[in-house]
A protein has these predicted regions:
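Bacterial signal peptide processing site
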Residues: 20-24
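An acidic-aromatic pocket/loop used at catalytic or ligand-binding sites
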Residues: 12
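Bacterial N-terminal signal peptides that target proteins for export
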Residues: 1-9
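C-terminal motif of bacterial Sec signal peptides marking the signal peptidase cleavage site
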Residues: 15-18
Length: 222
C-alpha cells in the first residue's frame, strides 16, 4: 500500500468514527437518548392561614414539610404547593383540606372522602368540648398533644358520642367532662361567617346532587 493510499484510508476512518460510524447520525442527539429535564420546583411562597370554628390554638398541622401548631387559628402553608394541609389533635387526625386562607371543620375530609356536614359538626362538637379557655376562641391543652388513635367523624350524632376514643378524649381533656350536642355546637358557630359560608357551600352541593337523582317507579311493585 502506497503512502498516499494509506493516508486516504486513515482519513476516511477518522471521519467515519467522528460521525458515529456512519449510521444513525449522531445517536446521542435522538429524543430517546435525551435526559429528562423536569420543570424546576416553584420557590416556596409561605402564607398564613386561619383554622376557625372559632380560631383554634393547639391544633397540630402538617402541610408537606411544614408542620407546627396553630396559634389563635394561624398556620403556615406554601401557596405554591399542591399538598393538602391536615389537622390533628395530638396524633388524632381531624381531616385534610386543600390549602387556603380560611379553613373550617366543614372543609376537612378523610382520605378519599369529600367534606361533609355530619363530619364537620362532629369535629366542631369535639373541639368545643375540649376548649380550656374562657374566651370566644378555642384553646386545646398541651396534654391533648399526647392523644393517639383514629376517629371516624362521618357518623351519626349518637354513634359519635359513643365512640371509645371520643369518650376517652372527653373524659381526659374536656373541662366539663361532657361532649357537646350538635345543637350546642350549632349555636356556637352561628355567628361565624366563614363557617356559615362553608356550611352553605356543602348544602348547595348536597341539593345539586339530590336534584340530579331520577326516581323511576316500578309498576310491578304497586
Amino acid at each position: 500500500m502506497t503512502l498516499l493510499k494509506w493516508n486516504l484510508w486513515a482519513l476516511t476512518f477518522v471521519v467515519l468514527v467522528s460521525c458515529g460510524g456512519g449510521g444513525g447520525g449522531g445517536g446521542d442527539s435522538s429524543p430517546s437518548n435525551l435526559e429528562d429535564n423536569p420543570e424546576p420546583e416553584l420557590p416556596q411562597d409561605l402564607q398564613t392561614g386561619i383554622f376557625t370554628d372559632a380560631p383554634v390554638t393547639g391544633l397540630r398541622y402538617e402541610h408537606g414539610r411544614i408542620t407546627g401548631y396553630t396559634d389563635d387559628g394561624e398556620f403556615q402553608y406554601d401557596a405554591n404547593s399542591s399538598d393538602p394541609v391536615c389537622f390533628y389533635i395530638g396524633e388524632v387526625r381531624l381531616g385534610c383540606s386543600v390549602v387556603g386562607a380560611i379553613i373550617t371543620p366543614f372543609d376537612l375530609s378523610a382520605p378519599g372522602q369529600p367534606a361533609g356536614l355530619q363530619s364537620g359538626y362532629n369535629i366542631t362538637r369535639l373541639l368545643n368540648s375540649l376548649d380550656v379557655s374562657d374566651t370566644p376562641e378555642i384553646s386545646l391543652s398541651e396534654e391533648t398533644r399526647r392523644a393517639t388513635g383514629i376517629i371516624t367523624f362521618a357518623v351519626s350524632d349518637a354513634v359519635f358520642a359513643t365512640d371509645e376514643l371520643v369518650v376517652d378524649l372527653v373524659n381526659r381533656y374536656a373541662p366539663e367532662g361532657v361532649l357537646l350536642s350538635r345543637e350546642q355546637a350549632s349555636n356556637l358557630i352561628a355567628d361565624n361567617a366563614d363557617v356559615q359560608t362553608a356550611i352553605s357551600n356543602l348544602n348547595q352541593v348536597l341539593n345539586e346532587s339530590v336534584s340530579g337523582i331520577t326516581i323511576r317507579w316500578n309498576g310491578a311493585l304497586t
